[in-house]
Every structure is written in structure tokens, then in C-alpha cells.
């Protein structure tokens, strides 16, 4: 099955991410999508929207440990709170 993915890099704020996902959800509700569709928003926007069943969320980055004193990093334990199962490499 093909995968369609969008990596936001640092191009969206929480508000613009929410608006983008809202429009994407509307499109997916009215169109048959057989592909797996993923978005990779900024880490500050991981909880700023709701996904429909055809859309999956991933993280742009993660540090290779569950947690610890790693300034500025995102640990796997933190991503688990958002039910993140996919990370860009």
C-alpha cells in the first residue's frame, strides 16, 4: 500500500497545523483514500488537532532513550503520550 507523508519541518505554528489538519480531514472524509497518510508536525503541535481514522501522526525527531537529562531532546516516553508510533529517520 502506498504511503503519502507530509513533513512540516518548522513551517507551521500550532494554529496553522490545526487548520491544515482540519482541511485534510474534511478532504479525506469526502474522498476515498486507500493510501496510508501521515503527517509529521512540529513537536510543539503534536496535540493541537484531531485526526480522523484515515490520517496518522508521526514525530520528526526523537532521542534514542526513554527519558533522561538531554536538553532540548524528545524522549520516547514523551512521544508515547501522543501515541506516536512513527518517527522520521
What are these regions (language model features)?
Residues 1-74, 81-82:
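Conserved N-terminal beta1-alpha1 strand-loop-helix module at the mouth
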Residues 85:
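Short acidic/polar active-site loop segments enriched in Thr and Asp
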Residues 89:
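Short beta-strand and adjacent tight-turn residues that come in two discontinuous sequence segments
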Amino acid at each position: 500500500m502506498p504511503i503519502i507523508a507530509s513533513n512540516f519541518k518548522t513551517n507551521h505554528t500550532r494554529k496553522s497545523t490545526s487548520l491544515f489538519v482540519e482541511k485534510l480531514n474534511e478532504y479525506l472524509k469526502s474522498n476515498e483514500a486507500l493510501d496510508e497518510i501521515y503527517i509529521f508536525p512540529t513537536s510543539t503541535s503534536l496535540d493541537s488537532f484531531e485526526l480522523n481514522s484515515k490520517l496518522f501522526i508521526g514525530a520528526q525527531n526523537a532521542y534514542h532513550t526513554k527519558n533522561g537529562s538531554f536538553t532540548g531532546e524528545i524522549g520516547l516516553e514523551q512521544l508515547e503520550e501522543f501515541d506516536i508510533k512513527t518517527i522520521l529517520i
